[in-house]
Amino acid sequence: MSGEFPSAFLFPDPALADKEGLLCFGGDLEPSTLLAAYSQGIFPWFNAGDPILWWSPHPRFLLFPSELQFSRRTQKRLEQCAFEVRADERFKEVIGGCQKAVRKNQEGTWILPKIVKAYEHLFEEGYAHSLEVYKEGELVGGLYGVSLGAAFFGESMFSRQDHASKAAIRELCRLGVERGWKMIDCQIHSEHLERWGARAVDRERFLVLLKEALKEKTWRGRWSLN
């Protein structure tokens, strides 16, 4: 799977990851390395002072676009909020919003300057994408991730107003259904994503789904929402 994205850094078999999901460390964050990693079900995640750490957790947390579940109350609230969602207009601001977001039980951020730079390069190459959520012209939320074949790898999201991140996820799933995505990779478990319909899939099954997804067209370049 990594043949399409030659990298000087060769990744081990994802099955060799430890029980926490840590597979290896080192390498770089060049676009070719990141794409080779994603195509093998591997992603970077590390804190300041750490080497570059690469992960392939078991189980994997996935959201299938057609399985998004919002309560009637949430759906009603989203309609009342009347958010506008756009794509790939303010990638740098979206990743910056994710970087600054305060998260429960988390000190600081793993979205370090080198991560920001790496994903900005992927955006320039047409593989990383952002969804921006607006309220009365103001950016109030969004998400970003990587698109390869019929898979979207979600990296992070933020919300400055209640329900803004839900609007981003809803639009992402709508786009996924429209484009025939096999899955949205959420990487690791989170309670709110589980409430929205995401579920755990064992690594072997995830890698089979990924292999199938990579046979499909990659929606590379700037996205425009209908």
Curated annotation (Swiss-Prot):
Enzyme class: transferase
GO BP field: protein catabolic process
GO function term, MF aspect, one: leucyl-tRNA--protein transferase activity
SUPFAM superfamilies in the cross-refs: Acyl-CoA N-acyltransferases (Nat)
A GO-annotated cellular component: cytoplasm
EC assignment: 2.3.2.6
Cellular localisation: Cytoplasm
Top-rank taxon: Bacteria
Main location: cytoplasm
Annotated keywords: Acyltransferase, Cytoplasm, Transferase
Catalytic activity: N-terminal L-lysyl-[protein] + L-leucyl-tRNA(Leu) = N-terminal L-leucyl-L-lysyl-[protein] + tRNA(Leu) + H(+); N-terminal L-arginyl-[protein] + L-leucyl-tRNA(Leu) = N-terminal L-leucyl-L-arginyl-[protein] + tRNA(Leu) + H(+); L-phenylalanyl-tRNA(Phe) + an N-terminal L-alpha-aminoacyl-[protein] = an N-terminal L-phenylalanyl-L-alpha-aminoacyl-[protein] + tRNA(Phe)
Summary of the function given for this chain in its UniProt record: Functions in the N-end rule pathway of protein degradation where it conjugates Leu, Phe and, less efficiently, Met from aminoacyl-tRNAs to the N-termini of proteins containing an N-terminal arginine or lysine.
NCBIfam families: aat
HAMAP family attached to this UniProt entry: Leu_Phe_trans
Membership in a protein family: Belongs to the L/F-transferase family.
Entry-linked PANTHER family: LEUCYL/PHENYLALANYL-TRNA--PROTEIN TRANSFERASE, LEUCYL_PHENYLALANYL-TRNA--PROTEIN TRANSFERASE
Name of protein: Leucyl/phenylalanyl-tRNA--protein transferase
Organism expressing this protein natively: Wolinella succinogenes (strain ATCC 29543 / DSM 1740 / CCUG 13145 / JCM 31913 / LMG 7466 / NCTC 11488 / FDC 602W)
